């Protein structure tokens, strides 16, 4: 989608969080990306490294992939899915709908302070 | 020296989502049912809208916001049908966002032709409707699951062309339902008019349901 502008918004969120934590240094952040958020994870990881390193030295960027859940239309098995086609690993039938996997959020930050 | 992990859980698109929530609240208060139409380029959004407007204009107040990367061509086509049309030229942008969308019973938002990015941006609409023409291939729902997953309805367009194609309606339905079993399906041809009655009566039903919900919410207030 728009991974570079998403990375910039992620940096803004981190900066706002840091304002609440005086004298802290950002060391890591975690971003949760749903399988159906239309975001390319590799590109986002690359863009995050670029934009974060402009302001913060040595920050570790973790991109956490969030799968969706599908239910088999035939045997009813619930299984995790990250991409189509959504076929049941047990019986091979197609799913009856996919839920979840829509996340796109800053999950956590890690900071170090002199305290 | 101490290290700690701070839970944030803030949506990356929270600024857009907040604007969308404000737009949604305003539209609902004014009892405007807003449909965000999403599809690939050339699947027939503008043509379907022209037919829909002609059928529904006698009974409802309609409005259209038409997003295009460049030109006002889509908006100009719709203006000829005698309804208020707002053109949004994104100037290269491949989707609309909530900032660009701010009185009618039924408002259509014709998004930019693209099945990827428009799925990700909430505009504050009542529902997303995804369009897909029969010439595009049956596996569109599998290739672009985000758009189909978030839509309330799927409108198949150009069905008059089916006799000339190797196209299985059953397979599209199977693929679409594997992504989203709650999709309401419409098979339409703007050329012959097939299926347009079902589509417009579904829209009219949604408008009526919103009005009923708003009225009962109003009468429930002390």
Task: Give residue spans per PLM region.
Chain A
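Short functional micro-motifs and their immediate structural scaffolds
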Residues: 80, 93-97
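Short loop/turn motifs enriched for small/polar and acidic residues
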Residues: 32-36, 64-68, 109
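Short, flexible, mixed-charge glycine/proline-rich loop motifs
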Residues: 60-67, 77-82
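Long, charge-rich boundary regions
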Residues: 2, 20, 30, 104-115
